[in-house]
Amino acid sequence: MTARHPEAHLSHRSGWLRAAVLGANDGIVSVAAIIVGVAAAGSSRSAILTAGIAGLVAGAASMAAGEYVSVSSQADAERADLSLERRELTEDPAGERKELAAIYRSRGLSAALADQVADELSAGDVLSAHARDELGMTELSHARPFQAAGASAASFTVGAALPLLAVIVSPANTRIELTVAATVVALALTGYMGARLGGAPPGKGTLRVVIWGVAAMALTMVVGRLVGTNV
């Protein structure tokens, strides 16, 4: 008899993975675009690095704050829903038991089996049963603000460090070209890794990330050259 291999599910990664991939891509694109724009204006290496580091610090702080506020709002909504459900279970347990049975009937169970399942779950941790089956809340989907904020800030910093490193090691006459090349490679890698970790086809996701990153750098390069010419 062939041993059955456990399936590798990816849904438990959804919260931190989304924040980490978004943070890394944003760090790469944001700081690379700043660097290319400032370099296109004819600025010195020192000025370019100063602008890039400032963008890294500001971006990491902004990503962390944004994720924390967003996920905290989600957590507040979850707590409010659970509080409401807890009150309804106290005030009308029979009605909530019927509601639970109706949910199971809508999923294909017979009326008798749905009633039996609702009775057994209601005899145990009934709030968890309603949270899972009525509200769609599970431990895997539970909002974690600090985890999301930390993942965003850390990944933004790592992503932003790549174009900064390209500026440090590249000569002045090829600084823009090497920064763009390093950024494209980094975006391709993060796009590919994000797609693979998320269980999605990597080709389309990688191409989408690279195209938008190149577009952002092209725009800031044009602006940088215009400003450098006219100022």
Residue ranges and their predicted role:
Residues 1-19, 71-153:
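Cytosol/matrix-facing amphipathic helices and coiled-coil assembly/linker segments
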Residues 189-214:
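Interfacial loop-to-transmembrane junctions
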